[in-house]
Amino acid sequence: MLNVFRIAGDFSHLASIIILIQSITTSNSVDGISLKTQLLYTLVFITRYLNLFTKWTSLYNFLMKIVFISSSVYVIVLMRQQKFKNPVAYQDMITRDQFKIKFLIVPCILLGLIFNYRFSFIQICWSFSLWLESVAILPQLFMLTKTGKAKQLTSHYIFALGLYRALYIPNWIWRYYTEERFDKLSVFTGVIQTLVYSDFFYIYYQKVIKLGGDLELPQ
């Protein structure tokens, strides 16, 4: 049975990637974008899809895995190119991108080792990717608090990325009733991720949707 929530979530994720790439290429700048968050997302998708060529579910799943891995790597390449194309903006981004990601990666490794469905390398990496994805946006939000504002395209990107995971909550409910499947790890980490975005969603609605301007944090 067609799961519209899953598809809507995936396309929201694709939209966030397109918005981010457009923001970098049209402005020729990485102003307000966290390289550390992009590195974390790349790590998320690489560790989650280690079974890319060994476990076949559907053509849709296979293509989405390819898109998410390749696009996350492509974004990092685009951002690194700005070091030479726009060195001033790139250095400014590096200066502001100060979140210590080791404090995210190490606990997520430990959680992956403790909470998994089978103590195997692929399963531990899969669990690690869920925990890491739930907090991967934190360097971006931390940068936002340091600058106090974000361009419209950047805020649209963060919103679409948060919406993707929020849509997975009704997806899990749908799967529970249609497939009698309940993935506790995915649900728990997904709820954490949605809560991480909650303040941003409210400010985005108030500042960007209602007023149509750039996103600015309240003083």
Curated annotation (Swiss-Prot):
Localization per record: Endoplasmic reticulum membrane
Keyword hit for Transferase: no
Membrane topology: Multi-pass membrane protein
Predominant localisation class: endoplasmic reticulum
Residue ranges that the UniProt entry lists as topological domain Cytoplasmic: 23-36, 83-102, 144-155, 206-219
InterPro entries (UniProt xref): ER_ret_rcpt (IPR000133)
Site (Important for specificity of recognition): 51
Disulfide bonds: none
Transmembrane parts of this sequence: 4-22, 37-54, 63-82, 103-116, 124-143, 156-174, 185-205
Sequence ranges on the Lumenal membrane side: 1-3, 55-62, 117-123, 175-184
GO molecular function, one term: ER retention sequence binding
Described purpose of this protein according to its UniProt entry: Required for the retention of luminal endoplasmic reticulum proteins. Determines the specificity of the luminal ER protein retention system. Also required for normal vesicular traffic through the Golgi. This receptor recognizes H-D-E-L and D-D-E-L, but not K-D-E-L.
Family, similarity comment: Belongs to the ERD2 family.
Name of the protein described by the UniProt record: ER lumen protein-retaining receptor
Gene this chain is encoded by: ERD2
